[in-house]
Amino acid sequence: MEKNTIILAAGQGTRMKSKLYKVLHQVCGKAMVDHMLTQVEKTNMDHIVTIVGHGAEKVRELLGDRTEYAIQEQQLGTGHAVLQAEKILGDKDGMTMIVSGDTPLFTAKTFENLFEYHRQKGAAATILTARTENPFSYGRIVRNEVGVVSKIVEQKDATTEEAEIKEINTGVYCFDNQKLFAALHQVKNDNAQGEYYLPDVIGIMKDAGEIVAAYEMADFSESMGVNDRLALSKATKVMQRRINEEHMVNGVTIIDPENTYIDYGVEIGPDTIIEPGVQIQGNTKIGSSSVIGAHSKIVDSTIGNRVTVTSSQIESAIMHDDSNIGPHSHLRPQAEIGEFAHVGNYCEVKNAKLGARTKMGHLSYVGDADLGTDINIGCGVVFVNYDGMNKHHSTVGDYAFIGSNSNIVAPVTIADHSYVAAGSTITNDVNKFEMGIARGRQVNKEGYFKKLPVYDAALKAEEENNK
């Protein structure tokens, strides 16, 4: 039997107060509609149709050919939105599930259970329901004395007795595909908003004597919809807890899960330790037995095994096995740190490679350069790579030594086994076994201190200290 899904993603989302299309707002690094599509894909659909309207091109750009699309030109209600999929699904048999693109917390397991329950019941329609102690604002599921669904009643229309019902409509449905579109053509818009509502299909099917079932899901939190920034924050918190728990189950130590922020899709190996305040975002992979120190931020990067990151920021970079960085250093895009290499405190690396066992202890900048293995970079070294118009590249060979407070003015090549004396500004190549030294010769002027303004201040301080 064919399985289809329609994702409703045409709403404008005015309550978000945003220029960004509502379903494109992110929850843990992934757009809400992308979360939904990912879970739907896991249930092996024959057809997936996304209903788009406002912001259609941006949704298409994000989701690509993972789904088919139908356009709702006018916002005339959820029933009208589903009807736009008829030209794609109208001649199909089987089952069709309808979900919303602004409910990012649903799981594939819940959808699989819904399809199976619908099939077992032989129903024309199955409503996905949940129980909550605070059902206010949700439609209530009214059942008869034998547990069969009688109707869905909205909050504003509920009697006092009906308002006490804890079972609510999550807004997800599974239908017999042919009966769905037949019923949609009978939906009227004789309401205050002049819209065609999808839940009216349930009443039409009941009146026609069709079987209408309800499957109660286990976790109410999955059904959380996002209509404003407050709900977005709540959904993000639920998703973050889910992500962190999955990593911990898989062998990752997260010291403070409530204050650790890991995007959906991030990969972390076992025995890695994540300290409080860490943010791990985008397409990031972290190996095993690494330590990500407090308040570090890692974005779109690959971190190897046994790597230590101490309070540093890493973006679009690579750290190979057994390397370390920090505290308070920054790897910018296209930085690559070799095995056992060391980047200490207050350093920055951009579009540059540090080879294995190369050490860069403190207060240095390496940009647009290739550095070999076993190099020592002293304190305050700067690779001068920009002439005001263009970036230029430098190369440093294996076993070289770059003395403190040196400037390497690109483009230059510093060969294997060469030495740059501290305080030098290097503008020419340094060959193998050579020492490059480029600094003014020191001259000591006898008695000159007494001619300087600071001399009087120093005498006064000395007199005060000797009293």
Curated annotation (Swiss-Prot):
Pfam families referenced in this protein's UniProt entry, alphabetically: Hexapep (PF00132), NTP_transferase (PF00483)
Cofactor, how bound (note): Binds 1 Mg(2+) ion per subunit.
EC number: 2.7.7.23, 2.3.1.157
The protein's role, per its UniProt record: Catalyzes the last two sequential reactions in the de novo biosynthetic pathway for UDP-N-acetylglucosamine (UDP-GlcNAc). The C-terminal domain catalyzes the transfer of acetyl group from acetyl coenzyme A to glucosamine-1-phosphate (GlcN-1-P) to produce N-acetylglucosamine-1-phosphate (GlcNAc-1-P), which is converted into UDP-GlcNAc by the transfer of uridine 5-monophosphate (from uridine 5-triphosphate), a reaction catalyzed by the N-terminal domain.
Principal cellular location given in the protein's record: cytoplasm
Cellular component terms (Gene Ontology): cytoplasm; membrane
Subcellular locations according to the entry: Cytoplasm
Pathway in which the depicted protein is active: Nucleotide-sugar biosynthesis; UDP-N-acetyl-alpha-D-glucosamine biosynthesis; N-acetyl-alpha-D-glucosamine 1-phosphate from alpha-D-glucosamine 6-phosphate (route II): step 2/2; Nucleotide-sugar biosynthesis; UDP-N-acetyl-alpha-D-glucosamine biosynthesis; UDP-N-acetyl-alpha-D-glucosamine from N-acetyl-alpha-D-glucosamine 1-phosphate: step 1/1; Bacterial outer membrane biogenesis; LPS lipid A biosynthesis
Gene Ontology MF: a single term: glucosamine-1-phosphate N-acetyltransferase activity
Active site: 362 (proton acceptor)
Protein name (record): Bifunctional protein GlmU
Protein family (similarity comment): In the N-terminal section; belongs to the N-acetylglucosamine-1-phosphate uridyltransferase family. In the C-terminal section; belongs to the transferase hexapeptide repeat family.
Cofactor: Mg(2+)
Catalytic activity, as annotated: alpha-D-glucosamine 1-phosphate + acetyl-CoA = N-acetyl-alpha-D-glucosamine 1-phosphate + CoA + H(+); N-acetyl-alpha-D-glucosamine 1-phosphate + UTP + H(+) = UDP-N-acetyl-alpha-D-glucosamine + diphosphate
Enzyme class of the recorded protein, top EC level: transferase
Region (Linker): 230-250
Region (N-acetyltransferase): 251-467
InterPro entries given in the database record: Bifunctional_GlmU, GlmU-like, GlmU_C_LbH, Hexapep, Hexapep_transf_CS, NTP_transferase_dom, Nucleotide-diphossugar_trans, Trimer_LpxA-like_sf
Annotated keywords: Acyltransferase, Cell shape, Cell wall biogenesis/degradation, Cytoplasm, Magnesium, Metal-binding, Multifunctional enzyme, Nucleotidyltransferase, Peptidoglycan synthesis, Repeat, Transferase
